[in-house]
A protein has these predicted regions:
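N-terminal targeting leaders
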Residues: 2, 8, 13-178
Length: 178
């Protein structure tokens, strides 16, 4: 019975998210399945999973890889894993070579993402803009922005992200509606 309740809660949550999303329901589900599959494959690769930190974000078939690996070869391997899945339209590999990120840095990144998302709620004057359509992910102070947005929306989102204290750099991974 608990499993059914969890499934119903997940479905209700997903339905609420999809209401605001410019992607189709099928695309949202496909993105989630792709993300989970790629993460699983990376975690099953013992060399990639050990002493490396790779995060995967998928939006509209575009895969963003961020984090750190100990070698460029491992970064390339993570990219190859992602490219091996049907439905992947493009892979953006932003994995850096270097030591694994500390837990404290990860917490700071989550706070930074929250600050940027909060700032997006202040965007007014753009007809139809919904800040929930923008995916904000932060790694080592670098903010990655994904979503299906207009050029005007993208410019405002980037402007707000850059103005957020603590942001080192902003990387656009948008797809444009116009």
């Amino acid at each position: 019975m608990t499993r059914i309740a969890a499934i119903l809660l997940a479905a209700a949550t997903l339905a609420g998210c999809i209401f605001h999303d410019r992607r189709s329901f099928g695309s949202v589900i496909d993105d989630q399945n792709l993300e989970l599959s790629i993460i699983d494959s990376i975690n099953r690769d013992k060399e990639l999973a050990l002493k490396n930190h790779v995060e995967v974000v998928v939006y509209n078939g575009v895969v963003l890889l961020i984090g750190r690996t100990s070698t460029a070869e491992l970064s390339a391997r993570a990219e190859q894993v992602a490219m091996g899945y049907q439905g992947v339209r493009r892979v953006v590999n932003e994995i850096e070579v270097g030591p694994r990120i500390d837990v404290g840095d990860t917490t700071s990144d989550k706070v930074l993402s929250t600050r940027v998302k909060t700032g997006l709620a202040d965007i007014v004057g753009i007809k139809g803009f919904d800040p929930t359509r923008v995916n904000v992910t932060t790694e080592a102070g670098v903010v990655y922005l994904m979503g299906l947005v207009s050029q005007e929306e993208a410019e405002r989102v980037v402007e707000i992200a850059r103005a957020t204290p603590g942001v080192q750099r902003v990387v656009r991974v948008f797809e444009y509606t116009d």
